Design a protein with these regions (language model features):
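Membrane-interfacial segments at transmembrane helix termini in multi-pass membrane proteins
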Residues: 1-47, 138, 142-165
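Structured cytosolic domains appended to multi-pass membrane proteins
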Residues: 51-165
Length: 165
């Protein structure tokens, strides 16, 4: 009986521990996933605006499909003041606010700086630059971006010829 009670207490602690429990781990992973999805949404809208297109194409709509994560992503972006809430129901017409454009610009800047860094310092081919930059862009804050920019002598364009904001 004591072994069963001890096992039960261990199981409860293993699941509910605020720092190392499974539930806390799942919550942290979901928050990170939501942050990355929000960053991706802002970057897609920024790139669309940068190219002068008003509507998203089918490939871009995949990023903001009708899943729960997508809905939470848009809600989070609106609550942070990054997306214009008046067009929230129209996925093809999502618009950044000035604050959202600044955030998206930072994400795209990090992406393009990382591509430039990989191309220059590791001599990676252009077709091998996008995926690592797609991951790194979510973790490159202003300090790292500034350091990368200085290290790269403030490049104006990335290896693909896109301007670095």
């Amino acid at each position: 009986m004591i072994a069963v009670a001890s096992g039960g207490l261990f199981l409860v602690a293993w699941i509910l521990s605020p720092k190392h429990g499974r539930l806390a781990h799942l919550i942290r992973r979901f928050r990170l996933r939501l942050q990355i999805a929000t960053d991706d949404l802002l970057a897609v809208i920024y790139r669309r605006e940068e190219s002068g297109r008003l509507l998203m194409n089918h490939g871009e709509n995949i990023v903001i499909s009708s899943s729960l994560l997508s809905w939470l992503t848009k809600k989070r972006a609106v609550s942070k003041g990054w997306l214009d809430s008046s067009v929230l129901d129209s996925e093809s017409r999502l618009q950044l606010t000035p604050k959202g454009r600044e955030m998206a610009q930072s994400i795209v800047r990090g992406h393009r700086l990382w591509e430039s860094f990989l191309h220059r310092d590791f001599q990676l081919a252009q077709d091998h630059l996008h995926e690592p930059a797609e991951i790194a862009e979510h973790f490159l804050g202003p300090d790292l971006q500034r350091e990368l920019s200085e290290r790269l002598d403030t490049p104006g364009t990335d290896p693909h010829g896109q301007s670095i904001p």
